[in-house]
Structures are given as C-alpha cells and as structure tokens.
C-alpha cells in the first residue's frame, strides 16, 4: 500500500507515513485496521454471514488473526459482538 502510494506520488514511505499520521492522528496500518473493524461490525449486526465470511470480506485471510484484531480494537470477540446486537 505505502509502496504503491510512495511511487505514485514520488515521495518516500517514511515521509508519507509521517504526513498521514500528522493529518489523521494515527498510522496508516491502524487506520486500515479500524476501517476493516468498522465494516466488520456493520456486517456482524446486519448480516447472517459467518465470522469467516466476514473476515474474508473485510480483507483478512486468517480468521483467527481477524478475531484477535477485532478483540484488540473492541475488547470483545466478533461472536460476542454479534450476540450483543
């Protein structure tokens, strides 16, 4: 991601990361994770998709990594989140 953007705009990955964090207050990776988790939360609430299907739809190939990432952000597992809503 950063490689593509840095080549496209002719700036270093370091500078691009620095500017992104300055503008948005978070790293590119954290921003992407938060966007994925936000989309996953929507799918958990409004679809009947399985956790594996949701993980794949939001860009995770490994469902266990998705569950760990979700729990790190939301402090509950995707399954617990779905039951809550």
Question: Residue locations for each model-derived region?
Answer:
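Acidic/proline-rich low-complexity IDRs
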Residues: 1-4, 42
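Append "Primarily bacterial transcriptional regulators
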Residues: 3-12, 16, 20, 54-61, ...
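Terminal helix-turn-helix DNA-binding modules in bacterial transcription factors
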Residues: 22-67, 83-85
């Amino acid at each position: 991601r950063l490689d593509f953007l840095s080549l496209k705009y002719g700036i270093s990955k370091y500078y691009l990361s620095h500017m992104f964090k300055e503008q948005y207050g978070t790293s590119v990776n954290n921003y992407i994770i938060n966007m994925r988790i936000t989309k996953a939360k929507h799918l958990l609430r409004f679809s009947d998709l399985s956790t594996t299907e949701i993980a794949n739809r939001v860009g995770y190939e490994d469902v266990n990594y998705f569950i760990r990432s979700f729990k790190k952000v939301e402090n509950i597992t995707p399954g617990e989140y779905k039951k809550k809503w």
